From Swiss-Prot:
It holds the Pfam family DUF1846_C. This is UPF0371 protein Cgl2998/cg3325. HAMAP family: UPF0371. NCBIfam families: PRK13663.1. Belongs to the UPF0371 family.
Amino acid sequence: MSIGFDRDLYIKMQSQHINERREQIGGKLYLEMGGKLFDDMHASRVLPGFTPDNKIAMLTELKDELEILVAINAKDLERKKTRADLDISYEEDVLRLIDVFRELGFLAEHVVLTQLEDDNYQALAFKQRLERLGLKVAVHRVIPGYPTDARRIVSEEGFGINEYVETTRNLVVVTAPGPGSGKLATCLSQIYGDHQRGIKSGYAKFETFPIWNLPLEHPVNLAYEAATADLDDINIIDPFHLAAYDTKATSYNRDVEVFPLLKTMLEMLSGSSPYKSPTDMGVNMVGSAIIDDAACQEAARQEIVRRYFKALVDERREEQDDTISARIAIVMSKAGCTVEDRRVVARALDVEESTGAPGCAIELNDGRLVTGKTSELLGCSAAMVLNALKELAGIDRSVDLLSPESIEPIQSLKTQHLGSRNPRLHTDEVLIALSVSAANSETARRALDELKNLRGCDVHTTTILGSVDEGIFRNLGVLVTSEPKYQRKALYRKR
């Protein structure tokens, strides 16, 4: 895949722009950070050249001047919401985030529980857990009339009921495990609390997507819409920016909805607002670091198709209706892409049709397509991995990396001693067996050395993956999708 984004240019421009905004605001600046800070996989997929740690690398230049505050929506704890890219709960991700921030030398000691209600026992238990771990927790309540009733919100009956976070540095980065966590409300509540204490403070937003200086229906912006389809977010032209400057800028519905509150609040607290539009609030320089628009457009279209398959599988797993996948189907239409644009889909389906059993296909980074079929010894995903490694290592397809004699004892262990009904080897078992063989086989060693070259490859399977295969592909950095059907009919599914 062609590089479409200049990482180094971005880091330089972005840190400079944040410092310029700090000088403009004066006093304390609350910087709302949208998206993921140090593992932004979505951005790295739709902007080839953007590395998952891009944003944290940029913030490292300001490390000694900032502290990090993590917000989490109490309702997400009650819903047991998870990060799909890492397959961990938001609850665990808060702890993971703080650990990583601290390891990198950032000050991170505050968590804000937003929209907490007294009957949310899951969130209350998490609050106690955080406090036992030595973290400082502030509680923010559900405010009636938010975000429309500005006068109530900017009062003791609004932000006044929230607990105030005692920050110690003049740049406060507010982040969260995912969207809808209440980052903006946290910033506004803090500004209100600062004003009550005579502290000058302001707000700015660093949201990677949608990219304000790309067209509304640019595939990169549409990919963000697909990624947030469960929130029913939509990209829109910023009407305030258009009115103020007669210039079109891309924003999204929640920013536009809350802007009147932010503007009114800043006027009530400071006498005036520095911003005429939601776009003015932002400090995002991502669009200015795109160096190959065509490469980014193609990467974004592929991401939209992946999101569509993911929605179909999630709906099948959770036995939900097709609301989310239907929204993404509309986005696909706007972006001008279909499932046929994902080359591995047709190849995997061809394998299934010709064998009558589940099939799998991978597109290597140079465009070669490799398939895997289900056999008595191997599942199709495991077979595909072995075939892909042989292709990368230049090993003839007729060569067995693992002999039937080496596989059969593993099958016996699974079925006779470990209680498995499926004798076929999964991807993890195949890779362990290959690692053992590599000690005595130069061919196996060559194949194993190619594992790193699977990262970033696209894979499609004709049935929903089990948790083991799914986890292995995630760890390998493979971009996998599946048809929304199970290999066998059953009511109970082990996750």
